[in-house]
């Protein structure tokens, strides 16, 4: 614009009334402008032409005289309304639409010089020279700046480009404000009117545009919406009618092209109209059909969503996975007591103390005792751990909360810890109560440093804090059940969290008898059924397996059309569980059947003539499960420990099948049927050497991880295992050579009857004949 040391502030508010008062006041009298007394002589302090005052001092004097109100109010040109009406009107119209902040109005152009009507202003006696002199004093001048002692008196305004900042602005202001043109070729009033059209472009805008008036913003928005609403109907109307004339013209043109007589033109138009109406009716019918189809699909969709939400399984899953605050509902176990638990008397006795505490806590607290916080049930699968927990809740008649360890953690981080908090919060609100966590090892496993699962420890940490943290949980008993107690974290199984650890073993003969009686009372069975005989033949069966045995017998009796369950059905179900289901549809040729008969009879001969081997239960060449034959061995009594002789006898029995094939068919015709037998024998020999300390060379030292041992030690272990297997093979070969006749008779009996029990095997080995079935 000007030199960078100049200060230009063209936005000046000069009310029109002040200008008129200044014109009417005599020369030697004072004028009041905005409440400030200013002498006219002071206004007429004109600087000689050869020494133009600086723009800075003149503008400062101008501000002092006129008492400027505010800069940028949108009224900069209002004081000169009478001098140039048309440009001022346009400027006022542009400025009235702006708000109270600085908005740059659009520049306008003055095509002709403004005309002065002094008569309307009452200034007919004033001369043009006086008016020019007065306006010249009122307007800021542009001249060379003075030397200023303080830099605070100078305002530096950045131009719109680096070129203007460095070299100055070469626009019309520089030309009009030069000394020669400004003083000799134009008057001040004419110059300012000519420059007025460029001033809005150079108005300095201060402030933040984000603080615009909300009222004006809403008003402008509503105006734009109104304009859009006014434009839209006319646009749509024009869009719809844009081709109507052409359609009419095309119809007339069509009639002319077809040379339709004028007498038939009306009929043509009528037919065209009828066809058009029919097409519209067809279109309307199609639209109605589509509308009905959409409505039907929408209703079906709503019913489908409603049905999914009402589905119990889906609703529960949705309920438990949508949020962290899943509801916890207690279950009353009034129909389950300790009478339903059979075969685990020691475990029942331990838990009855807890039930007594829940029923009568004062009996224990009066002596200073505290309720145990946690009870850990440990045992193999199917021994009744969950049933014991339900019996505790049923006997104590308290709320029972059930949760599985795998239900806590999901795909979201923090869900497991949140559900632990919700579970214990609900339990504390309903204390005294029982919380049963099944499969505790899935949530309470040992914590490890793993970068792959950094958040997996949150759930167990929350469980530890809830069980024995800063806040006590009086009246809440936690019962946990697991099949792998060695996998639990040490902080979880310490006293204070799980105070009691109850082992739930497999039932013994007495326990199996009680369990069989309990489940037999639920079905119809013959009086000849002896539960003790079945119990002796089901060594190692758990409570769940015994329940399955009775259920399979009932199903077999129903299939055979019997009214009661007999021993035959119970034996059938026992063999089905021990040896697998029969595969009678399999067709086996005589050669393979003969090999199988001699193979299975070899196992039976070794088991029968070895002193410490388990007694034979049944032998069969009927395909069962993955095998072509099977010999079932059952101990007469429960075995709590096994001797070295018993382990060697098991190895000898396993070797009997391959030895029989070698002796009968030769080494070139041995089969792969002995692979599982060798696996079993190798496992027994390896445990004898590495765990049981039954090797004379290696002694009683155990070797848990053979991969970390020295090559010499590994070689010694392998040598000892090889010796045990070789000796077992030789013993089995000696027995079969000694009892070759009995071996042959038993194989022929198996080929004839397919299945033989223990008594029938004994009859055959004694040289007697079996009764015809």
From Swiss-Prot:
<dbReference type="InterPro" id="IPR005936">
    <property type="entry name" value="FtsH"/>
</dbReference>
<dbReference type="Pfam" id="PF00004">
    <property type="entry name" value="AAA"/>
</dbReference>
<keyword id="KW-1133">Transmembrane helix</keyword>
<feature type="topological domain" description="Mitochondrial intermembrane">
    <location>
        <begin position="317"/>
        <end position="773"/>
    </location>
</feature>
<dbReference type="InterPro" id="IPR037219">
    <property type="entry name" value="Peptidase_M41-like"/>
</dbReference>
<dbReference type="GO" id="GO:0035694">
    <property type="term" value="P:mitochondrial protein catabolic process"/>
</dbReference>
<dbReference type="GO" id="GO:0005743">
    <property type="term" value="C:mitochondrial inner membrane"/>
</dbReference>
<keyword id="KW-0496">Mitochondrion</keyword>
<feature type="binding site">
    <location>
        <position position="603"/>
    </location>
    <ligand>
        <name>Zn(2+)</name>
    </ligand>
</feature>
<dbReference type="GO" id="GO:0043066">
    <property type="term" value="P:negative regulation of apoptotic process"/>
</dbReference>
<dbReference type="GO" id="GO:0008283">
    <property type="term" value="P:cell population proliferation"/>
</dbReference>
<feature type="binding site">
    <location>
        <position position="677"/>
    </location>
    <ligand>
        <name>Zn(2+)</name>
    </ligand>
</feature>
<dbReference type="GO" id="GO:0007005">
    <property type="term" value="P:mitochondrion organization"/>
</dbReference>
<dbReference type="GO" id="GO:0004222">
    <property type="term" value="F:metalloendopeptidase activity"/>
</dbReference>
<protein>
    <recommendedName>
        <fullName>ATP-dependent zinc metalloprotease YME1L1</fullName>
        <ecNumber>3.4.24.-</ecNumber>
        <ecNumber>3.6.-.-</ecNumber>
    </recommendedName>
</protein>
<comment type="similarity">
    <text>In the C-terminal section; belongs to the peptidase M41 family.</text>
</comment>
<feature type="binding site">
    <location>
        <position position="599"/>
    </location>
    <ligand>
        <name>Zn(2+)</name>
    </ligand>
</feature>
<feature type="transmembrane region" description="Helical">
    <location>
        <begin position="296"/>
        <end position="316"/>
    </location>
</feature>
<dbReference type="InterPro" id="IPR003960">
    <property type="entry name" value="ATPase_AAA_CS"/>
</dbReference>
<keyword id="KW-0645">Protease</keyword>
<comment type="subunit">
    <text>Homohexamer; may also form heterohexamers. Exists in several complexes of 600-1100 kDa. Interacts with AFG1L.</text>
</comment>
<dbReference type="GO" id="GO:0016020">
    <property type="term" value="C:membrane"/>
</dbReference>
<dbReference type="InterPro" id="IPR041569">
    <property type="entry name" value="AAA_lid_3"/>
</dbReference>
<dbReference type="GO" id="GO:0016604">
    <property type="term" value="C:nuclear body"/>
</dbReference>
<dbReference type="GO" id="GO:0034214">
    <property type="term" value="P:protein hexamerization"/>
</dbReference>
<dbReference type="InterPro" id="IPR027417">
    <property type="entry name" value="P-loop_NTPase"/>
</dbReference>
<dbReference type="GO" id="GO:0004176">
    <property type="term" value="F:ATP-dependent peptidase activity"/>
</dbReference>
<dbReference type="GO" id="GO:0097150">
    <property type="term" value="P:neuronal stem cell population maintenance"/>
</dbReference>
<dbReference type="GO" id="GO:2000035">
    <property type="term" value="P:regulation of stem cell division"/>
</dbReference>
<dbReference type="GO" id="GO:0009267">
    <property type="term" value="P:cellular response to starvation"/>
</dbReference>
<feature type="binding site">
    <location>
        <position position="383"/>
    </location>
    <ligand>
        <name>ATP</name>
    </ligand>
</feature>
<keyword id="KW-0812">Transmembrane</keyword>
<dbReference type="GO" id="GO:0034982">
    <property type="term" value="P:mitochondrial protein processing"/>
</dbReference>
<feature type="binding site">
    <location>
        <position position="385"/>
    </location>
    <ligand>
        <name>ATP</name>
    </ligand>
</feature>
<keyword id="KW-0378">Hydrolase</keyword>
<keyword id="KW-0225">Disease variant</keyword>
<dbReference type="GO" id="GO:0005739">
    <property type="term" value="C:mitochondrion"/>
</dbReference>
<keyword id="KW-0999">Mitochondrion inner membrane</keyword>
<comment type="similarity">
    <text>In the N-terminal section; belongs to the AAA ATPase family.</text>
</comment>
<dbReference type="GO" id="GO:0005524">
    <property type="term" value="F:ATP binding"/>
</dbReference>
<keyword id="KW-0862">Zinc</keyword>
<feature type="topological domain" description="Mitochondrial matrix">
    <location>
        <begin position="1"/>
        <end position="295"/>
    </location>
</feature>
